Amino acid sequence: MNKITHRIATVAPGSIAEELELAPGDVILAINDQEIEDIFDYHYLVEDEYLVMLVEKSDGEQWELEIEKDMDEDLGITFENGLMDDYKSCSNKCIFCFIDQMPPGMRDTLYFKDDDSRLSFLQGNYVTLTNMKEKDIDRIIRYRLDPINISVQTTNPELRCMMLHNRFAGEALKKIDTLYEAGIRMNGQIVLCKGVNDGAELERSIRDLMKYLPYMESVSVVPVGLSKFREGLYPLTPFTKEDACEVLDLIHRWQQVCMQEHGTHFIHASDEWYLLAERELPEEENYDGYIQLENGVGMLRLLKEEFTEALESVPGDPELVREISVATGRLAAPFLQQMLELLTEKYPQICVHVYPIRNDFFGEMITVSGLLTGQDLKKQLSVVPLGEKLLLPCNMVRSEEKDFLDDVTVEELEKTLQVRVDIVKSSGTDLLDAIIK
């Protein structure tokens, strides 16, 4: 057991832990004579009404505490390490891995490749199953840690071994069978690579994954991201508009099959495909409740629906004069520009500049807002009118630190551009509020 991962960070006022005189810095060693592997063991063990907890105080003294409480009553403790264990790192060398495409000199945390099923449950991360042992599967089933999000890429075992550069990657697909038989809910992801797992291979994957319905609730298809730092890596090429149209046609055909046979669309294309193909986004009902939102599936449709609904609920103000700017990735900029034109009827004197930012840092093939850097924003926005404030989507910055991928801070950007910078949450309501308030 790593004592560092079991160290208490906070004790809630008025909680059982406070009554027991537990304090930040104390370490939980065991509960009911059982060592704690991670946060799931902890929550499972503290559900009981009667507990015997072994604690090591910050001065090294050990306390044995007998606790009587209501069933499921929380002790009021948080830990310095939210997982209460070391994160499991990825053992693959995927041909599409974006971390392998990053330049040197960035902060260390950006180079860590996690492949931890527990983070799949806690944070929605996608896992390949290649480093998941039998005991990990057993714990997922015992604790009902679902949904589990799986990076499938392909259901062709040989091709999966090649794509993940791991000779066990094909065999790992059998773990999906075990999860399915146990009734564990799952979501899948396919990172599509041109000429590798698209076309007939994509059809095979969709057909195979449909067998896991209803427990496999959805599968997203996202295009591979390619930076300019690919020297020595597997030769991948970007998708064209024509490619995107073919991918969408294939997915739409299978959506019809899934709807007829299972009453769900099941397989979903991320927003990037529609923007690249210059096609209209599907209607809201096609997204099955936005189950794959974190993979960029339906994010723009939801943004527009929320923005439109919020705009309809306000009276408008023809006298409100305002000039502001919005910066975003090149791919979504035309969509955002068109959406913001809806303001004109109720707010005719509000001028919103939408600036598509070219990604010089990672390369022009990267067109999404979440991979833009502070230095690119500084350079490209310093020569255009910004008005009274600049709005940026929240996926550009780390939420707490308020800095970009290259460690430029929001405060630095404000000083360089001499304008107020507001970080806007991802909802359409928040975007409208940031514009009119």
Language-model features: locations:
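PDZ/PDZ-like groove recognition
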Residues: 1-12
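Flexible glycine/acidic-rich beta-alpha junction loops that bind and position SAM and/or redox cofactors
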Residues: 195-196, 216-242, 261-284, 359-364, ...
